[in-house]
Amino acid sequence: MKRISFLTGIFFVLGLVACQQPSPPTSQINDSNTPLHLLAPDYNFSYKEWSIAEIKQTIDPILGYLDKVTPIRVIDRESGKEITDYTKINQHSQLEQGDFRLASYEWGVTYSGMLEVARATNDPKYQEYVTKRFRFLSEMVPYFSQQAKEYNVVDGQMRQIIQPRALDDAGAVCTGMIKLNRIFPDMDFSNMINTYMDFIENKEHRLSDGTFARMRPQANTLWLD
């Protein structure tokens, strides 16, 4: 019995010693032993060259959403009814408001992006999105210009086109129109492009050396980019 107890004690001590032995060091992967470009990223988004089909699975639903929330209709502000006879546009008429403004700086960038997507994917839907809206805006210019002259009021979205007051009103949207016009020279957006270019060249605030600047939020504020 004593021998059994003795052996049990020895095995217990050996077990404790074994537990205290350091485990073999694990190799830490870093840039010193594995080039960064070979490391697997920690995020779940696949870091790879995506196919057009895979990209379109994501962006096609976005196009569908944007098409719905940026309508191209004129409504009566008081009744909310759509105006289809544009000769009846008056002081109560406005472009239907969606989630995004059709002539904003951000949407000018979006238009250019849509044209690039159409070129890269060979999908005409993206180009059609831009074409429909530019044609609509071009058609609206004479009616809302008359609105401004006759009633001294103008729809906010159309004001950015017919009475631009800042580079943000003009630059990005004008760029999108010029890009589309180069694809389709027969599309005439000169009634908008000329107004934009006149503002950019002759009316936008500049420093004495010609650098574009603006008077907000402080005098002679410059864009960092």
Language-model segments: which ranges?
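N-terminal leader/targeting segments
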Residues: 8-10, 144-145
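Low-complexity, Ser/Thr/Pro/Gly-enriched N-terminal "stalk/linker" regions
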Residues: 23-152, 187-190, 194-195, 203, ...
